[in-house]
Amino acid sequence: MFKHTLIALTLLAAATLFSLPAFSQEDMTHVPTDAFGKLERPAAVFNHDEHNEKAGIESCNACHHVWVNGVLAEDEDSVGTPCSDCHALEQDGDTPGLQDAYHQQCWGCHEKQAKGPVMCGECHVKN
């Protein structure tokens, strides 16, 4: 009886241990890249909530911004709206192209705060 219980507990522990990485991946945010087609580097991946907590970002519009007639709308955010709805692949007037928009948003903030990754391979990690 003890042998069967020990085997069952060992299998349960192993199943739990091996399932943990799957749960930790749930919170990972993949920067949308469908609009680009074939990529030179992998998409940037980060834990959204952990990033915002560590960076002290409290307002969604710090990253998910809305511009109205060339003015940043302070009380609005674009959560749920793909960046490609406003940013074409190439620059359009004063609106940066999609790749530049991503880079200006992320890299620009990291540079300004002197924190976070700024080298290509730090965000675009090859597996």
Curated annotation (Swiss-Prot):
The Gene Ontology terms for molecular function here are: electron transfer activity; heme binding; metal ion binding
The alphabetized UniProt keywords are:
Electron transport, Heme, Iron, Metal-binding, Periplasm, Pyrrolidone carboxylic acid, Signal, Sulfate respiration, Transport
- InterPro entries (UniProt xref): c3_cytochr_TmcA (IPR054899), Cyt_c_III (IPR002322), Cyt_c_III_dom (IPR020942), Multihaem_cyt_sf (IPR036280)
Pfam families recorded? Cytochrom_CIII
Q: Where in the cell is it found?
A: Periplasm
Keyword Electron transport among UniProt keywords? yes
List the CDD domains hit by this protein, alphabetically: Cytochrom_C3
Record's GO cellular component, any one? periplasmic space
Binding of heme 1 occurs at 48, 60, 63-64
What residue stretch is flagged as signal peptide?
1-24
Residues that bind heme 3, according to the entry?
51, 106, 109-110
Q: Which residues bind heme 2?
A: 65, 83, 86-87
- The superkingdom of the source organism is Bacteria
**Chief subcellular site?**
periplasm
Q: What does this protein do?
A: Exchanges electrons specifically with the basic cytochrome c3.
Protein known as: Acidic cytochrome c3
Q: Which organism is it from?
A: Desulfocurvibacter africanus (Desulfovibrio africanus)
The root-end lineage is: Bacteria, Pseudomonadati, Thermodesulfobacteriota, Desulfovibrionia, Desulfovibrionales
